[in-house]
């Protein structure tokens, strides 16, 4: 008896219908039925066939007459034509996509509402918990997951940046434990200057692994994640990096189509729109592009504006399976009225805004002051996999940036009167026209070897870079505060501290550049080798050494020229022991060096720069660091918790003694770094840390400096971002940030000035309306806390005021 849905062959066996056979189910992928995704489909089809056959055999006999079905007539099949090269590439691309889809599905243990990871998800993050990032971008130099890496690395995914409402890199300095904001030369309040673990890192910012020496204002609309490497990193990154380095990972083109638009409105006339679109053009080529528009004032500050626009474009081309070529280009343009902050009330040892002056008081001039920061950079990279053991990569970068401003410094205040309404200050001009041009090339050969049960990932690399900076100023509109005060033409004395009376005065001077810029050029040729040896995922040894040939020149249009060279050799070594698969204990040691003149944005020696007319050339500062730590992946490996003890020492540190620059100082920083990122439960996610430090000047040409702590850093800091998922698509969250006092000075904390400690609280509530639309209400600085970003190094400094309370409504559309 023949059953419906089955037929007999010549031997009377029951067979599955053709539509349920594995071969038919696989034809939409390719004609050969290969790959893990195909295997899964085959298994499913096979189970369906077995179920169908079993069901058929279990049916009771029917009394209906049998139906005879003639077997189809066999016909000769035409010979398959040989596929073209384009068809082969398309087939390979589909096979890769199927494998990637299968891997993504397997990785999502707790997907949102049972779905898969978002199409625009961070490729480096835990698919089930985007607060937890598993790997950093530099996969060759850091081949192991963060759990197995003997170094403290803080990684903020774009989801963390969004929930912190971090739209500019500077906000990371306000809300990250162990990182402090600083002010630059001449009170440059606009460049991103960071201190990591107590050391200046303003020239240790990288974009996709290539140094970005612009010291400009950096937006985050093109950012996938931000990586903070803590501790010396010269063997990875080259010169500097005494306290660590920051790497900005840009958004790259992918294989999944998506569209996302974020629209934001807020207090202080905030209007912001960002766009992010990824489109697969063909199986081998995809494009990702995005844009930014922002028009805004600054919360709690009068007249200050923060307008931005930008765009990025990224492409990925895989002409064959083993070759990937990527490009990206980013443009950002920021403008507005600059803000140099408020004067310092020396008698009360606080900024004037903590002594009764309104926090929004601005001392600039609307008819003169302006600020522009513009940056363009493009990167082309190729990755070729020779075989399973050898991969070659090469990157090329070109960059041009501009930082152009005239601002007003509120300096030399007269605050002796007991009545704050009678206090006065001098509003002095500060200006800069700075351009930065960079050409760089990185080449890596990565080798994966298995020697007697030990798996090696070794990297041999070279790097060549050319950096050129030109720094000019506007005629009569420059003032270096340290010392005798301002003599600039644009200075106005007798400005009332409580109510500046000259904000709208006209200026008869038309700003013009001096035309005699200070120019710096740095050529660096580097070679490095690194190896990570993993024995049964129990013992992991990591080490590397790097040589940098550093060649620096400084000149002006006047007959002033300086040239110097330095040969830098630095190394690192780390050992990891894993008592359990989810935990590691490690010890690490590393060195780094700061060559003379390596802070290219500075024209003064107190900031690490070298004037073209200097007669003194000093050797590199030498840094050594030891770290002992442990890391654990908890909650089904969706929560990474780490703790580390560290000590970093600097020798040959530069300082000015009796007006003469010397290199006889030394200091030490010790501390503990505790961090947690990921989920505590399926609904509750956290990201944050606690850093406690002690610093001490151990050598100095100024006897009174010995034993003092270091200036410009917060020795205790804490931050914690928390988010909880409710039912019906609701989420609530917030952030708490603490920073201890910051003491003023150039090197040692010897001025007696200080900024008070503070707590800052943020909060947000988010509602997913449907699968495409989400709305978020965000409150930043919820209690409207008056706190300060940084203070200048002089005896009577000015102080940068942090933003006040602000509310934002953010609408996100995803398609």
Question: In which residue ranges do the predicted regions lie?
Answer:
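Outer-membrane beta-barrel translocator/receptor signature
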Residues: 222-224, 235-311, 319-323, 376, ...
């Amino acid at each position: 008896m023949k059953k419906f849905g089955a037929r007999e062959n010549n031997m009377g066996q029951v067979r599955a219908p053709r539509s349920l056979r594995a071969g038919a189910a696989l034809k939409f992928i390719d004609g050969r039925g290969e790959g893990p995704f195909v295997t899964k489909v085959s298994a499913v089809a096979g189970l369906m066939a077995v179920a169908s056959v079993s069901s058929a055999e279990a049916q009771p006999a029917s009394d209906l007459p049998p139906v005879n079905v003639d077997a189809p007539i066999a016909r000769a099949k035409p010979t398959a034509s040989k596929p073209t090269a384009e068809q082969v590439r398309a087939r390979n691309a589909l096979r890769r996509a199927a494998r990637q889809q299968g891997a993504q599905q397997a990785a999502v243990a707790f997907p949102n509402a049972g779905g898969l990871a978002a199409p625009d998800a961070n490729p480096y993050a835990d698919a089930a918990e985007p607060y937890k990032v598993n790997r950093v971008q530099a996969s060759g130099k850091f081949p192991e997951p963060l759990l197995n890496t003997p170094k403290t690395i803080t990684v903020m995914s774009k989801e963390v940046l969004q929930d912190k409402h971090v739209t500019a890199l500077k906000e990371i300095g306000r809300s990250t434990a162990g990182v402090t904001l600083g002010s630059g030369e001449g009170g440059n309040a606009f460049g991103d200057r960071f201190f990591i673990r107590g050391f200046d890192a303003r020239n240790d910012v990288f974009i996709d692994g290539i140094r970005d020496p612009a010291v400009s204002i950096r937006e985050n609309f093109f950012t996938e994640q931000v990586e903070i490497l803590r501790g010396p990193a010269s063997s990875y990154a080259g010169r500097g990096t005494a306290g660590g380095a920051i790497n900005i990972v840009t958004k790259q083109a992918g294989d999944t189509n998506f569209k996302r638009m974020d629209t934001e409105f807020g207090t202080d006339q905030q209007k912001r729109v960002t766009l992010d679109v990824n489109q697969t053009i063909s199986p081998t080529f995809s494009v990702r592009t995005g844009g930014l528009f922002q028009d805004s004032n600054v919360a709690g500050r009068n007249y200050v504006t923060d307008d931005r626009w930008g765009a990025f474009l990224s492409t990925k081309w895989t002409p064959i399976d083993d070759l990937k070529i990527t490009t990206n280009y980013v443009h950002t343009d920021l403008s507005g009225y600059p803000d140099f902050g408020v004067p310092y009330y020396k008698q009360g040892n606080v900024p004037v805004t903590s002594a009764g002056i309104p926090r929004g008081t601005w001392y600039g001039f609307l008819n003169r002051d302006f600020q522009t920061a513009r940056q363009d950079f493009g990167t082309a990279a190729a990755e070729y996999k020779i075989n399973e053991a050898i991969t070659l990569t090469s990157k090329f970068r070109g960059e041009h940036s501009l930082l152009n401003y005239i601002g007003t410094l509120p300096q030399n205040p007269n605050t002796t009167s007991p009545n704050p309404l009678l206090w006065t200050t001098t509003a002095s001009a500060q200006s800069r026209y700075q351009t930065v041009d960079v050409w760089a090339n990185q080449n890596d050969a990565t080798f994966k070897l298995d020697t007697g049960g030990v798996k090696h990932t070794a990297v041999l690399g070279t790097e060549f870079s050319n950096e050129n900076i030109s720094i000019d100023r506007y005629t009569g509109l420059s003032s270096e505060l340290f010392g005798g005060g301002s003599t600039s033409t644009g200075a106005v004395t007798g400005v009332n501290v409580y109510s500046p009376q000259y904000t709208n005065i006209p200026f008869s001077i038309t700003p013009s550049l001096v035309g005699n810029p200070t120019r710096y050029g740095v050529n660096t040729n580097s070679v490095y080798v690194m190896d990570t040896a993993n024995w049964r995922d129990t013992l992991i040894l990591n080490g590397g050494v790097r040589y940098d040939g550093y060649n620096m020149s400084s000149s002006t249009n006047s007959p002033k020229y300086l040239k110097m060279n330095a040969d830098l050799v630095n190394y690192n070594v780390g050992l990891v022991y894993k008592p359990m698969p989810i935990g590691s204990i490690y010890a690490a040691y590393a060195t780094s060096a700061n060559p003379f003149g390596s802070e290219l944005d500075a024209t003064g020696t107190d900031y690490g720069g070298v004037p073209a007319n200097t007669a003194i050339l000093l050797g590199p500062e030498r840094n050594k660091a030891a770290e002992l730590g442990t890391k654990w992946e908890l909650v089904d490996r969706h929560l990474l918790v780490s703790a580390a003890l560290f000590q970093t020492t600097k020798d040959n540190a530069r300082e000015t003694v009796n007006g003469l620059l010397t290199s006889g100082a030394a200091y030490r920083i010790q501390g503990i770094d505790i961090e947690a990122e990921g989920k505590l439960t399926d609904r509750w996610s956290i990201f944050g840390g606690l850093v406690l430090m002690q610093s001490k000047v151990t050598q100095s040409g100024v006897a009174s400096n010995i034993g003092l702590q270091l200036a410009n850093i917060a020795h205790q800091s804490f931050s914690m971002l928390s988010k909880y998922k409710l039912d019906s698509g609701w989420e609530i969250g917030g952030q708490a940030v603490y920073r201890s006092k910051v003491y003023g000075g150039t090197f040692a904390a010897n001025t007696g000035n200080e900024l008070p400690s503070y707590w800052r609280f943020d909060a947000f509530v988010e509602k997913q309306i449907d699968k495409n639309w989400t709305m978020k209400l965000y409150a930043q600085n919820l209690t409207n806390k008056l706190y300060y970003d940084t203070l200048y190094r002089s005896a009577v400094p000015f102080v940068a005021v942090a933003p006040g309370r602000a509310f934002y409504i953010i609408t996100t559309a995803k398609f």
